[in-house]
């Protein structure tokens, strides 16, 4: 239902945000 969709969207957003934060604060070898 709608609640599950919202839950999944929130989960995806949290995962993306966590990934962005990790990328920001992790040294990136170039």
Swiss-Prot record:
In which organism is this protein found?
Answer: Physalaemus nattereri (Cuyaba dwarf frog)
What functional role does this protein have? Probably has antibacterial activity.
**Mainly localized where?**
secreted
Its protein name is: Nattererin-1
Report, as the record phrases it, the tissue specificity of this protein: Expressed by the skin glands.
| Compartment(s) | Secreted
Biological process terms from the Gene Ontology for this record are:
defense response to bacterium
Give the lineage: Eukaryota, Metazoa, Chordata, Craniata, Vertebrata
Which keywords does this Swiss-Prot/TrEMBL entry list?
Amphibian defense peptide, Antibiotic, Antimicrobial, Secreted
Question: Could you give one GO CC term from the UniProt record?
Answer: extracellular region
